[in-house]
Amino acid sequence: KEKDKIKKNLKLSTVEGCFWAIMYGGGETFLSACAVFLQFTPFQISFLSAFPPFVGSCFQLFSASIKNKFKDIKHFVVTMSYLQAMLWIVLVILLFYKPTYKYILIWSCIYWTTGTAIQPAWTAWMGYFVPRRIRARYFGKRNRIIGFISFLATLIAGFILDIYNDNM
């Protein structure tokens, strides 16, 4: 029974990682291209690439105390992941209105803050249900799958942007 539960959790973790890979490969890797499309200056683009991750990293100092306001680690990780995913819908809506730099910078700071807030809790959570004896093998396999999905998502997103760019 316990072995089946562990297998199920490991599978779900790999599926979750695949969705993250799609978000990363099909989204995050194109944020600078989005900034170029919006005709931001080179300095604005560099600041947009560097400042939000820095803000997110600083926010990690507070993520543990925020996590403690949730029922458990699982609810914190799931809630923050959901919020981070929903931010992509906000970005798509913003893009329809040709947003100013300020709005993209604010969006990016919130996006990176939610993502980096998740990391310590996610790592602790994985430690609870990935048995030590299989951790290295499991994460090696999981990372290969996620890397491949991220690669595909990046190529597909680039192809879609090429089609969109040709039709403008």
Where do the model's predicted regions map?
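Helix-loop boundary and gating motifs at the non-cytosolic
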Residues: 1-63, 67, 74-85, 89-92, ...
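Small-residue-rich segments within alpha-helical transmembrane domains of MFS-like 12-TM solute carriers
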Residues: 21, 25, 112-120
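Transmembrane alpha-helix termini and helix-breaking/packing motifs in multi-pass membrane transporters
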Residues: 29-37, 65-69, 91-97, 150-168
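Loop-to-transmembrane helix entry/capping segments in MFS-fold secondary transporters
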Residues: 42-43, 130-142
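Glycine-rich segments within core transmembrane alpha-helices of 12-TM secondary carriers
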Residues: 53-60, 116, 140-158
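Hydrophobic/aromatic and small-residue hotspots that mark the transmembrane alpha-helices
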Residues: 62-67, 126, 135, 157
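C-terminal ends and interior cores of transmembrane alpha-helices
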Residues: 77-99, 105, 159-163
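Intracellular juxtamembrane helix-capping segments at the cytosolic ends
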Residues: 115-131
